[in-house]
Amino acid sequence: MAVSSGNSSVNSSKKLFSGKKGQSIGIVRSMNYKIPGTFGLESGKTLSGVRVEYEMYGKMNADKSNVILICHALTGDAHAAGFHEGDKKPGWWEIVIGPNKAFDTEKYCVICSNILGGCKGSTGPSSIDPETGKHYGISFPVITVKDMVNAQKKLIEHLGVKQLFAVAGGSMGGMQVLQWTVSYPEMVRKAIAIATTASTTPQQIAFGAIGRKAITDDPKWNGGDYYGKEIPSQGLALARMIGHITYLSDASMQNKFGRLQQDTDKSGIKGTTGTEGKNSSEISSEISSISSEISSELSYDFTPNFQVESYLNYKGDNFTKRFDANSYLYITKAVDYFDLAKNGSLIEGFSGVTAKYLVISISSDWLYPPYQSQEIVSALTANGVDARYEEIRSQHGHDAFLLEEGQLSYLLRSFLSHILVSDVMNRNFYTVSRDETIEHSSKLMVKECVSHLPVISEDGKLEGIVTSWDITKAVACKINELDEIITRDVKYVYEDEKIEHASSIMEKHSISALPVIDSEHRIIGIVTSESISALFGKYD
């Protein structure tokens, strides 16, 4: 295993992350949420009755602070892990989601939803327009990645989650991660963007345009009105074949196929259905099936001679059985429109981001090359954002984020487990000044349900702390002035210190809360044993 950049040590992974081997989450079920009222789009148009398909793995803790949102790629869906009843194959990111895996469902509640515009349960062009009673087709309004994120936000709010512990995704899923932190910075603590870009390039737009033209030039597309009729399978299959080439690398194609020829005498030419949206074991078995029939004879006609041809043909054909052609048009268009630069500056575009970032590239990815991930990190760090860059060394190309279990798991675990005080502290807190009365402080504690009140000076600097126990003693001793009961030798922490340090101080001094201060001794938050337990109570 090799990982470049960052401060992580791959060789130490066994020491850092020992324990049980990851297991499947088991049987899961899909759920569907209907957004009430109308849903506004970036284009200015609206949709009614928007539905969002989603799956949830693991349980939310008491204050719902352990939720991780997974964003899927172009043709993925909400089924990221586990098995549906009767299925033999698990979700598309099974390698990292489940008990004792990187996204540990014993610790986190993991949610994945199908994007707006998709065809796997969420509202898209194949859905029924409530105004006409017919399929939307191309009357469905053009959407953007921002629209997708806005729909996800509606779901997250519906579930009662105020802040996501993390948002993660690869490829177009990575675009959604970036958009989340730009649109809703206060709602995301940690962001994991894998094999993605902050601004779609001309080459990437070109591949999308060719794929769309393959679909719209298919006579059976019929202007997008093919529902209940024969689908534009030829165009959709060709679009998928074109797209899938960009997911592989030259080295991976050489290793998988070389110039091996296909035995065309067989009644069926073996092939695979493509990797995106599939788990690693399924991908491996499909590729192996290609190698089972090899010929050294050239056909001297236009039937597929080479195994790579068979692979792409069957990949395209099988894709038409699970995906809607119009959805492909809309989603690739949304990818084309994606550009987080503001006034031509990505630094300006990221100016409001506050989440801690892990940006991962893949060494052999030529669809979203490493330099694009490096540009993201540079723009983030220019804004003072804590952003870490890592590169997965792999010959699998863009698809490596679905295949490289070892490297990916190490990076994810390392990033998620590196918890600082700033990740847990409460930035909405109440304070008092030392000239306040006991009565005022007591009423404030009762009203706001808090047991600790930091005492601050006029310029916001920490002077001490008062607890509910101090108030109780003051009442018993008939003390009226707050200044008489303040603890002045108060323990505190800084926001960039590890949460383990805060926890050890609490344990050593038998206290349940610590003020968080900045370099000028001004209070900026408070961390409590309750908040630590709420997020990490299941960790051991």
Curated annotation (Swiss-Prot):
It holds the Pfam family CBS. Substrate binds at R240, D399. Keywords: Acyltransferase, Amino-acid biosynthesis, CBS domain, Cytoplasm, Methionine biosynthesis, Repeat, Transferase. Pathway: Amino-acid biosynthesis; L-methionine biosynthesis via de novo pathway; O-acetyl-L-homoserine from L-homoserine: step 1/1. Residues 262-284 are annotated as: Disordered. Its main location: cytoplasm. Residues 66-404 form the AB hydrolase-1 domain. GO terms for biological process: methionine biosynthetic process. The keyword Amino-acid biosynthesis applies. GO terms for cellular component: cytoplasm. Residues 425-484, 486-540 form the CBS domain. It is found in: Cytoplasm. Its EC number is 2.3.1.31. Homodimer. Transfers an acetyl group from acetyl-CoA to L-homoserine, forming acetyl-L-homoserine. In vitro, can also use propionyl-CoA or butiryl-CoA as acyl donor. This is Homoserine O-acetyltransferase.
